Amino acid sequence: MGQEKHTDAASQSRDPEAVAAHENDQLRQRNHALAKALTRATEELRKAKAQLEQFMAPPLTMATMVRVHRCSTDEHGVRHASAEILNGNRRQIVPLSPTVNPAQLGSGQGVLLDANMVIVDSCETPTTGPMRAVSESLADGRLIVSDVGGNRGVVMRASAVARTPINVDDRVVIDPSGTYVLSVLPQEQAQDLLLEETPDVSFTDIGGLDEQIARIRDAVQLPFQHRDLFDRFDLKAPKGVLLYGPPGNGKTLIAKAIAHELAAGSGNDGVFLSVKGPELLNKFVGESERLIRRIFERAKELSGAGRPVIVFIDEMDSLLRTRGTGVSSDVETTIVPQFLTELDGVESLDDVMVIGASNRIDMIDPAVLRPGRLDVKIHVTRPDETAAMAITRHYLTDALPLEPGRDADALAASLVRDLFRRDESRLLATLDEQGRRRGIYMADIVSGAMLRNIVDRAKTKAVKAEILHGSVSRDDEPQGITEARIHEAIDDEYEQNRSTINETDPGQWLRINALTLAADGV
Protein backbone atom coordinates (compact mmCIF):
# COMPACT_ATOMS: atom_id res chain seq x y z
CA MET A 1 0.00 0.00 0.00
CA GLY A 2 2.78 2.45 0.93
CA GLN A 3 4.70 1.53 -2.15
CA GLU A 4 1.72 2.41 -4.37
CA LYS A 5 1.46 5.95 -2.85
CA HIS A 6 5.18 6.54 -3.45
CA THR A 7 4.79 5.47 -7.06
CA ASP A 8 1.86 7.89 -7.61
CA ALA A 9 3.86 10.85 -6.20
CA ALA A 10 6.85 10.11 -8.40
CA SER A 11 4.63 9.93 -11.43
CA GLN A 12 3.08 13.30 -10.59
CA SER A 13 6.51 14.89 -10.10
CA ARG A 14 7.45 13.84 -13.54
CA ASP A 15 4.31 15.44 -14.99
CA PRO A 16 5.56 17.80 -17.73
CA GLU A 17 2.96 20.51 -17.00
CA ALA A 18 3.88 20.67 -13.32
CA VAL A 19 7.55 20.86 -14.15
CA ALA A 20 6.95 23.66 -16.64
CA ALA A 21 4.85 25.63 -14.15
CA HIS A 22 7.54 25.30 -11.52
CA GLU A 23 10.22 26.50 -13.92
CA ASN A 24 8.03 29.44 -14.98
CA ASP A 25 7.68 30.52 -11.36
CA GLN A 26 11.42 30.45 -10.90
CA LEU A 27 12.00 32.40 -14.10
CA ARG A 28 9.41 34.99 -13.05
CA GLN A 29 11.16 35.49 -9.72
CA ARG A 30 14.51 35.88 -11.42
CA ASN A 31 13.00 38.37 -13.85
CA HIS A 32 11.60 40.48 -11.00
CA ALA A 33 14.97 40.44 -9.24
CA LEU A 34 16.75 41.47 -12.44
CA ALA A 35 14.23 44.28 -13.02
CA LYS A 36 14.79 45.64 -9.51
CA ALA A 37 18.54 45.45 -9.95
CA LEU A 38 18.28 47.22 -13.29
CA THR A 39 16.13 49.95 -11.73
CA ARG A 40 18.64 50.45 -8.95
CA ALA A 41 21.52 50.53 -11.43
CA THR A 42 19.67 53.06 -13.59
CA GLU A 43 19.06 55.32 -10.55
CA GLU A 44 22.69 55.11 -9.48
CA LEU A 45 23.73 55.91 -13.04
CA ARG A 46 21.49 59.00 -13.04
CA LYS A 47 23.03 60.17 -9.73
CA ALA A 48 26.53 59.61 -11.03
CA LYS A 49 25.71 61.48 -14.23
CA ALA A 50 24.22 64.40 -12.27
CA GLN A 51 27.28 64.59 -10.05
CA LEU A 52 29.54 64.41 -13.07
CA GLU A 53 27.61 67.24 -14.73
CA GLN A 54 27.94 69.29 -11.55
CA PHE A 55 31.67 68.68 -11.38
CA MET A 56 32.09 69.54 -15.06
CA ALA A 57 29.94 72.70 -14.90
CA PRO A 58 32.01 75.81 -15.68
CA PRO A 59 32.51 78.31 -12.84
CA LEU A 60 30.13 81.27 -12.55
CA THR A 61 31.43 84.79 -12.02
CA MET A 62 29.73 87.18 -9.61
CA ALA A 63 29.20 90.77 -10.74
CA THR A 64 27.21 93.82 -9.69
CA MET A 65 24.19 94.91 -11.69
CA VAL A 66 24.16 98.55 -12.84
CA ARG A 67 21.14 98.81 -15.15
CA VAL A 68 19.28 97.10 -17.98
CA HIS A 69 20.97 98.38 -21.14
CA ARG A 70 18.49 97.18 -23.77
CA CYS A 71 15.43 94.94 -23.91
CA SER A 72 13.47 94.36 -27.14
CA THR A 73 11.58 91.66 -29.05
CA ASP A 74 12.16 90.92 -32.75
CA GLU A 75 9.58 89.98 -35.39
CA HIS A 76 9.87 86.32 -34.43
CA GLY A 77 8.95 87.01 -30.81
CA VAL A 78 12.47 86.40 -29.55
CA ARG A 79 13.57 88.64 -26.69
CA HIS A 80 16.94 90.36 -26.92
CA ALA A 81 18.19 91.87 -23.64
CA SER A 82 21.50 93.13 -22.32
CA ALA A 83 22.64 94.75 -19.08
CA GLU A 84 25.42 96.99 -17.83
CA ILE A 85 27.39 95.39 -15.01
CA LEU A 86 30.42 96.04 -12.82
CA ASN A 87 32.84 93.16 -13.07
CA GLY A 88 35.51 94.09 -10.58
CA ASN A 89 36.44 97.64 -11.58
CA ARG A 90 35.37 97.19 -15.21
CA ARG A 91 32.04 98.27 -16.63
CA GLN A 92 30.71 95.81 -19.21
CA ILE A 93 27.56 95.29 -21.24
CA VAL A 94 26.62 91.60 -21.39
CA PRO A 95 23.60 89.64 -22.71
CA LEU A 96 20.89 88.18 -20.50
CA SER A 97 19.84 84.55 -20.65
CA PRO A 98 16.21 84.00 -21.76
CA THR A 99 15.58 82.47 -18.34
CA VAL A 100 16.38 85.75 -16.54
CA ASN A 101 13.64 88.37 -16.16
CA PRO A 102 15.15 91.87 -16.64
CA ALA A 103 12.36 93.44 -14.57
CA GLN A 104 13.61 91.60 -11.50
CA LEU A 105 17.14 92.98 -11.71
CA GLY A 106 17.95 96.11 -9.70
CA SER A 107 21.02 98.30 -9.42
CA GLY A 108 23.57 97.05 -6.92
CA GLN A 109 22.14 93.53 -7.05
CA GLY A 110 24.42 90.55 -7.52
CA VAL A 111 24.27 88.62 -10.81
CA LEU A 112 25.97 85.43 -12.05
CA LEU A 113 27.87 85.23 -15.37
CA ASP A 114 28.71 82.01 -17.19
CA ALA A 115 31.89 81.34 -19.14
CA ASN A 116 30.42 83.17 -22.15
CA MET A 117 29.76 86.31 -20.04
CA VAL A 118 26.00 85.81 -20.15
CA ILE A 119 23.87 86.66 -17.13
CA VAL A 120 22.30 83.33 -16.22
CA ASP A 121 20.92 84.08 -12.77
CA SER A 122 20.66 86.63 -9.98
CA CYS A 123 21.85 86.28 -6.39
CA GLU A 124 21.32 88.03 -3.08
CA THR A 125 22.72 91.50 -2.67
CA PRO A 126 25.83 91.19 -0.47
CA THR A 127 25.68 92.87 2.92
CA THR A 128 29.41 92.89 3.63
CA GLY A 129 32.13 95.12 2.30
CA PRO A 130 33.97 98.35 3.08
CA MET A 131 32.25 100.62 5.60
CA ARG A 132 31.92 104.36 5.07
CA ALA A 133 30.38 107.28 6.95
CA VAL A 134 27.88 109.50 5.14
CA SER A 135 29.12 113.09 4.95
CA GLU A 136 26.41 114.60 2.76
CA SER A 137 23.24 113.60 0.93
CA LEU A 138 22.84 115.12 -2.54
CA ALA A 139 19.52 116.20 -4.05
CA ASP A 140 19.58 113.47 -6.72
CA GLY A 141 19.91 110.70 -4.12
CA ARG A 142 23.65 110.20 -4.39
CA LEU A 143 25.72 110.24 -1.23
CA ILE A 144 29.11 111.68 -0.33
CA VAL A 145 30.89 109.24 1.97
CA SER A 146 34.27 109.21 3.71
CA ASP A 147 36.52 106.44 4.98
CA VAL A 148 38.58 106.20 8.17
CA GLY A 149 41.33 108.30 6.62
CA GLY A 150 38.92 111.08 5.66
CA ASN A 151 39.04 110.29 1.91
CA ARG A 152 35.73 111.22 0.31
CA GLY A 153 33.83 109.77 -2.62
CA VAL A 154 30.41 109.83 -4.29
CA VAL A 155 28.30 106.65 -4.33
CA MET A 156 24.83 105.70 -5.54
CA ARG A 157 22.12 103.84 -3.70
CA ALA A 158 21.53 100.21 -4.57
CA SER A 159 17.92 99.31 -5.34
CA ALA A 160 17.72 97.49 -1.99
CA VAL A 161 18.18 100.80 -0.11
CA ALA A 162 16.64 103.15 -2.67
CA ARG A 163 13.85 104.15 -0.28
CA THR A 164 15.73 103.67 2.98
CA PRO A 165 16.27 106.96 4.88
CA ILE A 166 20.01 107.67 5.03
CA ASN A 167 21.18 110.62 7.09
CA VAL A 168 24.46 112.40 7.61
CA ASP A 169 26.79 110.43 9.93
CA ASP A 170 25.05 107.13 9.14
CA ARG A 171 27.35 104.19 8.55
CA VAL A 172 26.88 102.33 5.26
CA VAL A 173 28.34 99.28 3.50
CA ILE A 174 29.47 99.80 -0.10
CA ASP A 175 30.34 97.31 -2.83
CA PRO A 176 34.03 96.52 -3.50
CA SER A 177 34.10 98.86 -6.50
CA GLY A 178 33.01 101.78 -4.31
CA THR A 179 29.98 102.55 -6.48
CA TYR A 180 26.89 101.46 -4.57
CA VAL A 181 25.61 101.63 -1.02
CA LEU A 182 24.47 98.08 -0.29
CA SER A 183 23.09 98.42 3.24
CA VAL A 184 22.81 100.80 6.18
CA LEU A 185 24.36 99.77 9.49
CA PRO A 186 22.61 100.42 12.80
CA GLN A 187 24.02 103.44 14.55
CA GLU A 188 25.74 103.36 17.90
CA GLN A 189 23.35 105.45 19.92
CA ALA A 190 24.55 108.02 22.40
CA GLN A 191 22.03 106.56 24.85
CA ASP A 192 24.23 103.45 24.99
CA LEU A 193 27.02 105.60 26.44
CA LEU A 194 24.94 107.87 28.64
CA LEU A 195 24.12 107.16 32.24
CA GLU A 196 20.74 108.83 32.55
CA GLU A 197 19.46 109.15 36.11
CA THR A 198 17.77 111.38 38.63
CA PRO A 199 20.39 111.83 41.36
CA ASP A 200 19.46 111.49 45.02
CA VAL A 201 22.76 112.97 46.26
CA SER A 202 22.50 116.30 48.06
CA PHE A 203 25.18 118.70 49.23
CA THR A 204 24.63 117.49 52.79
CA ASP A 205 26.00 114.11 51.67
CA ILE A 206 29.32 115.70 50.73
CA GLY A 207 31.82 116.46 53.43
CA GLY A 208 34.90 118.66 53.45
CA LEU A 209 34.11 120.68 50.30
CA ASP A 210 32.21 123.64 51.72
CA GLU A 211 34.13 126.26 49.73
CA GLN A 212 33.70 124.42 46.43
CA ILE A 213 30.01 123.81 47.12
CA ALA A 214 29.45 127.49 47.84
CA ARG A 215 31.12 128.49 44.55
CA ILE A 216 29.13 126.05 42.44
CA ARG A 217 25.91 127.13 44.14
CA ASP A 218 26.64 130.71 43.12
CA ALA A 219 27.58 129.71 39.58
CA VAL A 220 24.81 127.23 38.81
CA GLN A 221 22.01 127.25 41.35
CA LEU A 222 21.40 131.00 41.49
CA PRO A 223 20.89 131.48 37.71
CA PHE A 224 18.41 128.59 37.60
CA GLN A 225 16.37 129.61 40.63
CA HIS A 226 16.50 133.43 40.26
CA ARG A 227 16.17 133.99 36.54
CA ASP A 228 14.15 137.16 36.95
CA LEU A 229 16.94 138.84 38.90
CA PHE A 230 19.54 137.76 36.35
CA ASP A 231 17.36 139.16 33.56
CA ARG A 232 16.92 142.38 35.51
CA PHE A 233 20.67 142.86 35.82
CA ASP A 234 21.26 141.61 32.25
CA LEU A 235 23.43 138.84 33.63
CA LYS A 236 23.80 135.58 31.73
CA ALA A 237 24.15 132.25 33.44
CA PRO A 238 27.41 130.40 32.81
CA LYS A 239 27.31 127.80 30.07
CA GLY A 240 29.48 125.35 31.87
CA VAL A 241 31.54 124.52 34.91
CA LEU A 242 34.85 122.70 35.07
CA LEU A 243 35.69 120.76 38.22
CA TYR A 244 39.37 119.92 38.25
CA GLY A 245 41.79 118.46 40.72
CA PRO A 246 43.32 115.17 41.84
CA PRO A 247 41.20 112.03 41.48
CA GLY A 248 38.86 110.72 44.13
CA ASN A 249 37.90 114.00 45.79
CA GLY A 250 34.22 114.38 44.97
CA LYS A 251 33.97 116.00 41.53
CA THR A 252 31.26 113.58 40.37
CA LEU A 253 29.41 113.88 43.67
CA ILE A 254 29.30 117.67 43.33
CA ALA A 255 27.86 117.39 39.81
CA LYS A 256 25.17 114.95 40.98
CA ALA A 257 24.33 117.12 43.96
CA ILE A 258 23.84 120.24 41.86
CA ALA A 259 21.45 118.30 39.57
CA HIS A 260 19.53 117.19 42.66
CA GLU A 261 19.40 120.70 44.12
CA LEU A 262 18.27 122.25 40.84
CA ALA A 263 15.49 119.68 40.57
CA ALA A 264 14.38 120.38 44.13
CA GLY A 265 14.33 124.12 43.48
CA SER A 266 12.38 123.86 40.22
CA GLY A 267 9.85 121.32 41.43
CA ASN A 268 10.67 119.01 38.51
CA ASP A 269 12.79 115.89 38.41
CA GLY A 270 16.27 116.86 37.31
CA VAL A 271 18.17 114.67 34.87
CA PHE A 272 21.86 113.84 35.17
CA LEU A 273 23.41 112.77 31.85
CA SER A 274 26.81 111.30 32.58
CA VAL A 275 29.33 110.16 29.99
CA LYS A 276 33.05 109.45 30.18
CA GLY A 277 35.24 111.22 27.65
CA PRO A 278 37.08 108.12 26.34
CA GLU A 279 33.75 106.44 25.50
CA LEU A 280 33.08 109.12 22.89
CA LEU A 281 36.35 108.52 21.04
CA ASN A 282 35.87 106.46 17.89
CA LYS A 283 38.33 105.57 15.15
CA PHE A 284 35.77 106.19 12.39
CA VAL A 285 35.78 109.67 10.94
CA GLY A 286 32.85 111.75 12.12
CA GLU A 287 31.56 109.19 14.62
CA SER A 288 32.79 110.99 17.74
CA GLU A 289 31.34 114.25 16.48
CA ARG A 290 27.99 112.56 15.82
CA LEU A 291 27.89 111.18 19.36
CA ILE A 292 28.62 114.63 20.79
CA ARG A 293 25.77 116.10 18.73
CA ARG A 294 23.45 113.32 19.88
CA ILE A 295 24.24 113.93 23.55
CA PHE A 296 23.29 117.60 23.29
CA GLU A 297 20.19 116.69 21.27
CA ARG A 298 19.20 114.31 24.06
CA ALA A 299 19.72 117.06 26.62
CA LYS A 300 17.47 119.33 24.58
CA GLU A 301 14.80 116.61 24.40
CA LEU A 302 14.82 116.14 28.18
CA SER A 303 14.87 119.83 29.06
CA GLY A 304 11.85 122.04 28.89
CA ALA A 305 9.09 123.22 31.19
CA GLY A 306 11.72 124.21 33.72
CA ARG A 307 13.24 120.73 33.93
CA PRO A 308 16.97 121.09 34.68
CA VAL A 309 19.41 118.86 32.81
CA ILE A 310 23.06 118.46 33.78
CA VAL A 311 25.40 117.09 31.09
CA PHE A 312 28.37 115.73 33.01
CA ILE A 313 31.48 114.79 31.01
CA ASP A 314 34.04 112.95 33.10
CA GLU A 315 37.70 112.68 32.11
CA MET A 316 37.26 115.68 29.83
CA ASP A 317 41.00 115.94 29.19
CA SER A 318 40.93 112.70 27.19
CA LEU A 319 38.25 114.04 24.85
CA LEU A 320 39.17 117.72 24.47
CA ARG A 321 42.95 117.73 24.38
CA THR A 322 44.87 120.74 23.16
CA ARG A 323 44.89 120.70 19.36
CA GLY A 324 48.19 120.25 17.59
CA THR A 325 50.07 118.79 20.54
CA GLY A 326 50.70 115.48 18.79
CA VAL A 327 49.88 113.66 22.02
CA SER A 328 47.27 111.56 20.23
CA SER A 329 46.24 110.94 16.62
CA ASP A 330 44.97 114.55 16.39
CA VAL A 331 41.32 113.47 16.36
CA GLU A 332 40.77 116.45 18.66
CA THR A 333 41.20 118.77 15.65
CA THR A 334 37.60 117.94 14.71
CA ILE A 335 36.17 116.88 18.10
CA VAL A 336 37.03 120.14 19.89
CA PRO A 337 35.33 122.39 17.29
CA GLN A 338 32.24 120.18 17.35
CA PHE A 339 32.06 120.35 21.14
CA LEU A 340 32.52 124.13 21.07
CA THR A 341 29.73 124.44 18.50
CA GLU A 342 27.35 122.49 20.71
CA LEU A 343 28.47 124.37 23.82
CA ASP A 344 27.89 127.71 22.10
CA GLY A 345 24.37 126.51 21.29
CA VAL A 346 23.61 125.84 24.95
CA GLU A 347 22.79 129.53 25.44
CA SER A 348 19.48 128.86 23.69
CA LEU A 349 18.69 126.11 26.21
CA ASP A 350 17.78 127.71 29.51
CA ASP A 351 17.65 124.46 31.45
CA VAL A 352 20.86 122.75 30.31
CA MET A 353 24.18 123.05 32.13
CA VAL A 354 27.45 121.40 31.10
CA ILE A 355 29.77 120.27 33.89
CA GLY A 356 33.14 118.77 33.10
CA ALA A 357 35.59 116.98 35.36
CA SER A 358 39.29 116.48 34.81
CA ASN A 359 42.42 115.45 36.65
CA ARG A 360 44.62 117.26 34.08
CA ILE A 361 43.37 120.76 33.30
CA ASP A 362 46.70 121.47 31.60
CA MET A 363 45.81 119.05 28.78
CA ILE A 364 42.45 120.63 27.88
CA ASP A 365 42.31 122.88 24.81
CA PRO A 366 42.41 126.58 25.83
CA ALA A 367 39.41 127.36 23.62
CA VAL A 368 37.28 125.18 25.89
CA LEU A 369 38.47 126.98 29.01
CA ARG A 370 38.11 130.57 27.88
CA PRO A 371 35.36 132.83 29.31
CA GLY A 372 32.06 132.25 27.58
CA ARG A 373 32.62 128.50 27.37
CA LEU A 374 33.38 126.74 30.65
CA ASP A 375 33.10 130.00 32.56
CA VAL A 376 33.49 128.70 36.09
CA LYS A 377 36.53 126.67 37.09
CA ILE A 378 36.49 125.14 40.55
CA HIS A 379 39.56 123.47 42.00
CA VAL A 380 38.53 120.46 44.07
CA THR A 381 41.55 120.08 46.31
CA ARG A 382 42.67 117.29 48.58
CA PRO A 383 41.13 117.45 52.05
CA ASP A 384 43.08 118.84 54.98
CA GLU A 385 42.65 117.37 58.46
CA THR A 386 39.43 119.27 59.14
CA ALA A 387 37.90 118.26 55.81
CA ALA A 388 39.12 114.68 56.23
CA MET A 389 37.36 114.53 59.59
CA ALA A 390 34.09 115.71 58.01
CA ILE A 391 34.39 113.18 55.18
CA THR A 392 35.22 110.30 57.51
CA ARG A 393 32.20 111.05 59.69
CA HIS A 394 29.97 110.51 56.65
CA TYR A 395 31.11 106.89 56.46
CA LEU A 396 31.86 106.20 60.13
CA THR A 397 28.69 106.83 62.13
CA ASP A 398 27.41 105.98 65.59
CA ALA A 399 24.80 103.72 63.98
CA LEU A 400 27.54 101.19 63.16
CA PRO A 401 28.72 98.47 65.59
CA LEU A 402 31.63 100.23 67.26
CA GLU A 403 34.18 99.24 69.85
CA PRO A 404 32.62 99.41 73.33
CA GLY A 405 33.38 102.70 75.03
CA ARG A 406 34.31 104.50 71.79
CA ASP A 407 32.14 106.73 69.63
CA ALA A 408 32.41 107.60 65.95
CA ASP A 409 34.01 111.00 66.59
CA ALA A 410 36.86 109.46 68.58
CA LEU A 411 37.48 106.73 66.00
CA ALA A 412 37.36 109.22 63.11
CA ALA A 413 39.80 111.53 64.90
CA SER A 414 42.17 108.61 65.49
CA LEU A 415 41.97 107.68 61.79
CA VAL A 416 42.76 111.22 60.65
CA ARG A 417 45.67 111.65 63.08
CA ASP A 418 47.25 108.40 61.92
CA LEU A 419 46.74 109.19 58.24
CA PHE A 420 48.25 112.68 58.46
CA ARG A 421 51.37 111.67 60.38
CA ARG A 422 54.62 112.65 58.69
CA ASP A 423 57.06 110.04 59.91
CA GLU A 424 58.76 106.96 58.50
CA SER A 425 55.70 104.78 59.08
CA ARG A 426 53.68 106.86 56.59
CA LEU A 427 56.47 107.73 54.12
CA LEU A 428 55.52 106.27 50.75
CA ALA A 429 58.59 107.23 48.72
CA THR A 430 61.33 109.80 48.32
CA LEU A 431 61.34 111.17 44.77
CA ASP A 432 64.46 112.76 43.31
CA GLU A 433 64.56 114.69 40.04
CA GLN A 434 67.45 116.92 38.96
CA GLY A 435 68.61 117.54 42.50
CA ARG A 436 65.14 118.16 43.90
CA ARG A 437 63.98 115.69 46.48
CA ARG A 438 60.67 115.29 48.17
CA GLY A 439 59.25 112.80 50.60
CA ILE A 440 55.76 111.65 49.64
CA TYR A 441 53.58 110.83 52.65
CA MET A 442 50.07 109.44 52.90
CA ALA A 443 48.90 112.94 53.85
CA ASP A 444 50.04 114.17 50.41
CA ILE A 445 47.73 111.84 48.49
CA VAL A 446 44.76 111.57 50.84
CA SER A 447 41.38 111.83 49.11
CA GLY A 448 37.74 111.30 49.89
CA ALA A 449 37.85 107.99 48.03
CA MET A 450 40.83 106.86 50.13
CA LEU A 451 39.06 107.76 53.38
CA ARG A 452 36.01 105.77 52.37
CA ASN A 453 38.19 102.86 51.35
CA ILE A 454 39.95 102.83 54.72
CA VAL A 455 36.63 102.81 56.58
CA ASP A 456 35.39 100.00 54.32
CA ARG A 457 38.54 98.00 55.06
CA ALA A 458 37.93 98.39 58.81
CA LYS A 459 34.30 97.32 58.35
CA THR A 460 35.42 94.24 56.41
CA LYS A 461 37.83 93.27 59.18
CA ALA A 462 35.02 93.61 61.74
CA VAL A 463 32.69 91.45 59.63
CA LYS A 464 35.34 88.74 59.23
CA ALA A 465 35.93 88.77 62.99
CA GLU A 466 32.19 88.31 63.58
CA ILE A 467 32.11 85.38 61.17
CA LEU A 468 35.20 83.77 62.68
CA HIS A 469 34.37 84.16 66.38
CA GLY A 470 30.60 84.55 66.34
CA SER A 471 28.65 87.19 68.18
CA VAL A 472 29.93 86.18 71.62
CA SER A 473 32.13 88.87 73.09
CA ARG A 474 35.70 87.92 73.92
CA ASP A 475 38.13 89.89 75.99
CA ASP A 476 40.98 89.26 73.55
CA GLU A 477 38.91 90.07 70.44
CA PRO A 478 36.70 93.19 70.78
CA GLN A 479 33.69 93.22 68.49
CA GLY A 480 32.70 95.87 65.94
CA ILE A 481 34.86 98.57 64.36
CA THR A 482 37.79 99.12 66.67
CA GLU A 483 40.64 101.59 66.70
CA ALA A 484 43.08 98.74 66.13
CA ARG A 485 41.20 97.61 63.01
CA ILE A 486 41.15 101.16 61.69
CA HIS A 487 44.94 101.40 62.04
CA GLU A 488 45.30 98.00 60.35
CA ALA A 489 43.16 99.32 57.50
CA ILE A 490 45.43 102.37 57.19
CA ASP A 491 48.48 100.08 57.13
CA ASP A 492 46.90 98.04 54.30
CA GLU A 493 46.14 101.21 52.34
CA TYR A 494 49.69 102.44 52.94
CA GLU A 495 51.26 99.22 51.61
CA GLN A 496 49.05 99.26 48.54
CA ASN A 497 49.91 102.85 47.64
CA ARG A 498 53.62 102.35 48.30
CA SER A 499 53.77 99.41 45.89
CA THR A 500 51.85 101.44 43.30
CA ILE A 501 54.37 104.30 43.40
CA ASN A 502 57.30 101.91 43.04
CA GLU A 503 55.76 100.27 39.95
CA THR A 504 54.90 103.46 38.01
CA ASP A 505 56.77 106.32 36.40
CA PRO A 506 57.35 108.89 39.19
CA GLY A 507 56.94 111.93 36.97
CA GLN A 508 53.67 110.73 35.51
CA TRP A 509 52.44 109.68 38.94
CA LEU A 510 53.13 113.18 40.28
CA ARG A 511 51.23 114.84 37.42
CA ILE A 512 48.19 112.57 37.81
CA ASN A 513 48.08 113.24 41.53
CA ALA A 514 48.62 117.00 41.10
CA LEU A 515 51.88 117.01 43.04
CA THR A 516 55.19 118.78 42.41
CA LEU A 517 58.72 118.26 43.62
CA ALA A 518 59.24 121.00 46.17
CA ALA A 519 62.79 121.46 47.35
CA ASP A 520 62.79 119.55 50.60
CA GLY A 521 66.51 119.22 50.52
CA VAL A 522 69.26 117.80 48.41
From Swiss-Prot:
Pfam families: AAA, Prot_ATP_ID_OB_C, Prot_ATP_ID_OB_N. GO terms for cellular component: proteasome complex. Residues 1-26 are annotated as: Disordered. Residues 20-57 form a coiled coil. GO terms for molecular function: ATP binding; ATP hydrolysis activity. It comes from the Bacteria. NCBIfam families: pup_AAA. PANTHER family: AAA-FAMILY ATPASE, PROTEASOME-ASSOCIATED ATPASE. This is AAA ATPase forming ring-shaped complexes.
